[in-house]
């Protein structure tokens, strides 16, 4: 299944002008129609002859291309969305062969449909908008080329391949310290939004502590910001890829034919429908910030860099069982926090041994001024692990770490060296301790410990959001709101016939709820599905939305509610819609409340037997859609 960015398609369309600017609007419409005509011709040529490299290139030297197509506002972003790439020193856009032909066809169809609507005068002047994260740049230029950023003199004098790899991994993290890249990384993170969410969670936790509901120590806002950062990164910024979709059928079940190298990049070549597709396994952060896709290695690499962009002391962690994640130092807790960005997990280090049943032997963490053998944090059977470590002697390991550590710290100040030495000492003491795994670590769950769930607002969360009428809704005597679990976005809209105008949007399911208890959004990466469910190990989950029109003279005339649910086995979901002003019926009430309760189910996955708004991640439908008429 191939999805397209409709916002990019709509962004190039003319904007509605005031009555005195009708002539200017006609000119904009003509420019739009001509630009789309040219682009449609280009896309048709690619679809007709996909192997012809000439048709895959858009050159700026062409006068029509430059003056009629590329001059249209939003065109460059649309080309990028389709899959075109422009090198920094080139005057041409090229469409790589790994871009799916099905994707090109979908953009062609969407553009053709919108152009026809503009020609016939049947277009909605305010097409539905998609909520997106920050715009993906076509190219990011670092201060120094990747291979020079990771090139350092070797200090190890050993023939042991495993120990040599430790120095290579240590050199690789130095690519994060490029000032231009760090500045670019900061611009890609919605820092204000994430900080606001973290602050709201902190206030909620403070209230829980004050009421006696919570006994744990109050967390700091930087730790809560980290929780929001990894959730945003996992659900909105980065995309998991098993295989690049087939260019013919769009399937991701293609077969690996071979692995090859193009320069410094490892490339997986897969085949389906007789066509080869290439999956580039980028290590260069400047390329990952553009592609924003990969597997656990790319996830950890990019996320660790973004932590550095926000000035966290972060390090990338490589395990010998072929998994990669991040550790971030918490100044407030004075310890390193385990963060797995590909799993959206925080502070569950024993889950690999006990939940995933992985054999632990070597796990190393690398940062700009340190290297640490953190194997002992990820196991609670140290004696057994010692007998499994056969790749080098323990004394040789310590000597290697000391040599690499000295290499990384040679430019550190005396104060920094002292701080790092003291921190290392405390960490080593902590690593010697063994503890019992939590329930979540035993089951390998991705929701983290209860403490972190509360910090994420996923235990009990009262947002106190109430839907009141805006000026437009008051004038039109209607309130319409819908929610997409695929994009995790609410939209308020006005409706006239079949024409819809988006009035406002709210990102994340929590943003427009009144309250919830034991509810979280589950994303199934393997099945490409998303839904709201109750937390694991809870008997009941509840979520509510509130609508209040009491400050106006209007009451509910009628309403229509689409509210999709899915149950399995003994799972039960009850949905009630009740007036909030004491009225017997919602009709003629000045407000009402929608409440969904999730209960039942059997076994360890009982929580999964009750689901709200389940849909494909590629779906553009709205499994929650409320339309209220007022009088």
From Swiss-Prot:
Gene3D superfamilies: 1.20.58.2190, 2.20.25.10, 3.10.620.30, Peptide N glycanase, PAW domain. It is an enzyme of class 3 (hydrolase). GO terms for molecular function: metal ion binding; peptide-N4-(N-acetyl-beta-glucosaminyl)asparagine amidase activity. It catalyses: Hydrolysis of an N(4)-(acetyl-beta-D-glucosaminyl)asparagine residue in which the glucosamine residue may be further glycosylated, to yield a (substituted) N-acetyl-beta-D-glucosaminylamine and a peptide containing an aspartate residue. Its cofactor is Zn(2+). Its EC number is 3.5.1.52. Binds 1 zinc ion per subunit. It holds the Pfam family PUB. InterPro entries: Galactose-bd-like_sf, Papain-like_cys_pep_sf, PAW_sf, Peptide_N_glycanase_PAW_dom, PNGase, PUB-like_dom_sf, PUB_domain, Transglutaminase-like. This is Peptide-N(4)-(N-acetyl-beta-glucosaminyl)asparagine amidase. It comes from Drosophila melanogaster (Fruit fly).
């Amino acid at each position: 299944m191939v999805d397209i960015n409709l916002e990019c398609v709509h962004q190039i369309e003319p904007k509605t002008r005031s009555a005195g600017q009708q002539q200017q609007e006609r000119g904009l419409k003509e420019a739009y129609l001509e630009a789309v005509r040219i682009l449609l011709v280009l896309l048709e040529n690619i679809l007709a002859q996909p192997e012809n490299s000439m048709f895959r290139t858009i050159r700026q030297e062409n006068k029509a291309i430059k003056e009629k197509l590329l001059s249209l506002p939003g065109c460059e972003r649309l080309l990028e969305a389709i899959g075109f790439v422009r090198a920094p020193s080139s005057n041409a856009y090229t469409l790589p062969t790994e871009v799916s032909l099905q994707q090109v066809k979908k953009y062609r169809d969407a553009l053709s449909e919108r152009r026809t609507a503009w020609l016939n005068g049947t277009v909605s002047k305010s097409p539905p908008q998609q909520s997106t994260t920050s715009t993906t740049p076509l190219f990011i230029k670092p201060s120094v080329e990747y291979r020079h950023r990771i090139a350092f003199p070797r200090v190890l004098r050993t023939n042991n391949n495993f120990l040599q790899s430790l120095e290579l991994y240590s050199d690789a993290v130095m690519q994060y310290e490029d000032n231009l890249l760090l500045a670019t990384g900061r611009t890609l993170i919605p820092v204000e939004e994430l900080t606001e969410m973290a602050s709201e969670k902190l206030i909620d936790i403070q209230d829980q502590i004050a009421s006696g509901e919570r006994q744990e120590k109050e967390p700091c806002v930087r730790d809560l910001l980290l929780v929001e950062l990894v959730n945003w990164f996992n659900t909105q910024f980065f995309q998991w890829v098993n295989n690049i979709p087939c260019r013919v059928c769009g399937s991701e079940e293609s077969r690996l034919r071979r692995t090859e190298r193009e320069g410094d990049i490892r490339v997986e070549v897969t085949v389906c429908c007789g066509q080869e597709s290439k999956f580039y396994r980028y290590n260069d952060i400047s390329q990952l910030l553009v592609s924003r896709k990969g597997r656990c290695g790319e996830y950890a690499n990019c996320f660790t860099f973004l932590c550095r962009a926000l000035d966290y002391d972060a390090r990338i962690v490589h395990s010998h069982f072929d998994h990669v994640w991040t550790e971030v130092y918490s100044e407030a807790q004075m310890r390193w926090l385990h963060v797995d960005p590909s799993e959206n997990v925080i502070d569950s280090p024993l889950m690999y041994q006990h939940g995933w049943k992985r054999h632990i032997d070597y796990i190393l963490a690398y940062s700009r001024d340190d290297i640490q053998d953190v194997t002992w944090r990820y196991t609670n059977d140290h004696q057994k692990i010692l007998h499994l470590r056969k790749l080098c002697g323990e004394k040789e390991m310590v000597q290697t770490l000391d040599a690499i550590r000295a290499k990384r710290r040679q430019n550190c100040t005396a104060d920094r060296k002292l701080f790092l030495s003291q921190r290392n000492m405390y960490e080593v003491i902590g690593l010697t301790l063994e503890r019992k795994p939590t329930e979540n670590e035993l089951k390998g769950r991705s929701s983290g410990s209860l403490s972190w769930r509360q910090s994420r607002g996923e235990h009990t969360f009262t947002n106190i959001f109430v839907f009141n009428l805006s000026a437009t809704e008051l004038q039109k005597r209607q309130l319409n709101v819908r929610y997409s679990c695929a994009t995790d976005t609410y939209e308020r809209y006005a409706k006239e016939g079949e024409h819809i105008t988006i009035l406002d949007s709210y990102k994340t399911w929590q943003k427009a709820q009144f309250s919830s208890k034991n509810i979280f959004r589950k994303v199934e990466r393997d099945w490409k599905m998303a839904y709201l469910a109750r937390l694991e190990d809870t008997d009941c989950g509840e979520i509510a939305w509130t609508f209040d029109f009491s400050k106006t003279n209007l009451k509910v005339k009628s309403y229509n509610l689409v509210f999709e649910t899915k149950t399995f086995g003994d799972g039960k979901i009850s949905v009630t819609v009740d007036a909030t002003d004491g009225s017997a019926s919602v009709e003629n009430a000045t407000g009402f409340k929608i409440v969904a309760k999730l209960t039942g189910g059997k076994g360890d996955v009982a929580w999964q037997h009750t689901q709200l708004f389940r849909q494909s991640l590629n779906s553009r439908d709205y499994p929650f859609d409320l339309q209220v008429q007022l009088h």
